[in-house]
Amino acid sequence: MAKLFFRYAAMNAGKSTALLQVAHNYEERGHRVRIFTAKLDDRYGRGFVTSRLGPQREVEQFDAETDFDALIGETPGIACILIDEAQFLTKRQVQQLHEMAHLRNLPAICYGLRTDFQGELFPGSATLLALADEMDEMKTICDCGRKATMNMRVDAHNRKVTDGAQVEIGGNARYRSVCGRCFRQG
């Protein structure tokens, strides 16, 4: 039976790289995948899953209005659904992916952040934590050498930012992956 997977981590842990590798593994064996990323993530251009290591792939985009049930429907020959930036999924979209896994035997593997820069769950991540059949924490390290579990937003002077909108797209110039201690110390 297929499952809904949630593979989460702080930023810079290799989530997009892992997604691209999984897609390659399926396709190398002749299986079709559908890959989606959040429309609002434009760090590397819209509609791309991009690894900081270099590989990039054009993919389909989703936003809050995307209906995965209608989009994927009963499309034959799909072996797996892969979602990058899964923290931006809505509760309903996660429910749809869960239904596809259990009622259509179509696995969905979602990659994303668990929490925002204030340590709060994203709505999509909260629903994935509730419904995912299998969860895997991907690891990266803090500057101090400990395991990084938090995403710290920083200003132009590399100082911790504590206020602002939950979603602000940015890469290494705006965010640092840090351990809990460094997150609290700022």
Where are these regions (language model features)?
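Conserved ATPase-coupling elements of RecA-like P-loop NTPase cores
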Residues: 86-97, 117-122
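Short recognition patches in nucleic-acid-associated and regulatory proteins
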Residues: 141-168
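Short basic (Lys/Arg) and small-residue
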Residues: 132
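Conserved P-loop
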Residues: 1-72, 116-127, 137-140, 161-162, ...
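Residue-level preference for the first positions of well-ordered beta-strands
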Residues: 4-6, 32-34, 79-82, 107-109
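Conserved RecA-like ASCE ATPase "motif II neighborhood" in helicase/translocase motors
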Residues: 60-82, 91-94
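Walker B catalytic acidic pair
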Residues: 84-86, 112-113
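Sensor-1/coupling segment of RecA-like P-loop NTPase cores
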Residues: 101-123
